[in-house]
Amino acid sequence: MDIVKSIDTSVDAVLDEFDCAYFAVTLKVEFKTGKQLVCIGFGDTLLEAKDKAYAKLGLSIIEEVNSHTVV
């Protein structure tokens, strides 16, 4: 079991030639052991991109008072 130290989120959006927006959400997870994990989700909406990025983590997260324990 690893403890998550931080999760950084960044969002990028682009417009195509038809003014349609597309989004990419990047999650950078840093564990207390020093390991890092990066997941990127793409979608037509910000929510879709965010949901896809978190789904790619594939982790069970148990929230504690000041930290997250990853199972």
UniProtKB/Swiss-Prot annotation:
Query: Which source organism does the UniProt entry give?
Result: Canine coronavirus (strain Insavc-1)
Name the record gives this protein: Non-structural protein 3a
